[in-house]
Amino acid sequence: GITGICQIVKMTINYLKELGAKPFIVSAMGSHGGGTKEGQREVLTGYGITEEAMGVPIVTGTDTVDLGVNADGNHVWFDRAAYEADLIVPINRVKLHTDFIGELQSGLCKMLVIGLGNQKGCSAAHETDFCKFSNMLEESARLIIEKAPIGFGIAIMENAFDETCHLEAIPAQRMIAREKELVKLCVEKMPYIQVKKADIVIVEEIGKDVSGAGFDPNILGRSTVRTGYLLPIPEFQRMILLDVTDASHGNAIGVGLFDVITEKVFEKMDREITYANALACKCILDARIPMIAKNEEEAVRIAVKSCRNIDIHNLRIIRIKNTLKLEEIQVSEAIYKDEFL
């Protein structure tokens, strides 16, 4: 999730009220929440964004309007409730995307195209190959800014400690150009695992509140759609998953990138919600089921047994909370002696 998102949204609402506006919140999450009204409201509630807390109505829906065709020939769909408003203010974190590299990645433009596109717009956008995704976002965002009443956007940047380090209001006319500048700054703000080589990586949890892909491939280097990365990534053979966050509401997207999962992960996975997400972004391998272990101990035994050419008496194991929380990690004695002493 975005640090301080409730406070940022509330401050924006209060500012608009001071100007005489009567703001309301529109869920802008593409296929998240299963792509349903109820699911989207549940996700917002999980982040503390409720009508009572924000003091304004919240509109969740799937109805869209067709704004036209982008350069790839695909229709650009946009949330009807937002389109019929007098002014739209997108709020999002600008960061490196999990599936592609480009001048535009995750940010305000993606919020306009994917988030406010709802399930229909999200699926249409993902007709584009990821190698062309950044260009698609730019062309589609340009069309949306031209056709819809976008006023300004609130861009959020976070540092390696998951803390807000930059907050900026960007007029619609400068949104695309300014976001490109902010994306360049993201690389130096991103955390990474400072280990060169391991046998096994244990991840305690994945979830939509951690990353749109469940976990950030920029940190762990596993993806079904991308090959290049901008950050240093440890070399390892097996990856284990122990849990799915409660805030993910059963969405276990990303589970398919692991080699071994626990029964707890399998039991918490809501297949309908996970599959809806996987189909919307056309990454169905991200939802496949790996080998299932009873618990963490059995998962590690399976991982060790399936590794090749390792020293079983000096196992190199990394354990992290998730790809957002990297301030502290656990490493086995072999890694500690080799890389930190």
Task: Please give the residue ranges for each predicted region.
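An acidic, phosphate/nucleotide-engaging active-site surface
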Residues: 39-103
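Conserved, well-structured core segments that form the ligand-binding/active-site neighborhood
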Residues: 77-202, 206-207
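N-terminal active-site beta-alpha-beta segment that forms phosphate/nucleotide-binding
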Residues: 1-40
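A glycine- and small-aliphatic-rich helix-loop capping segment at beta-alpha/alpha-beta transitions
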Residues: 8-16, 39-50, 105-114
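Short coil/turn connectors at secondary-structure junctions
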Residues: 19-22, 53-56, 72-73, 83-87, ...
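C-terminal non-catalytic interaction/assembly regions of soluble proteins
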Residues: 216-341
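Short acidic, glycine/serine/threonine-rich loops at helix termini
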Residues: 7, 35-41, 69-72, 99-104, ...
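Gly/Ser/Thr-rich loops at beta-strand to alpha-helix junctions
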Residues: 1-6, 29-35, 95-97, 207-209, ...
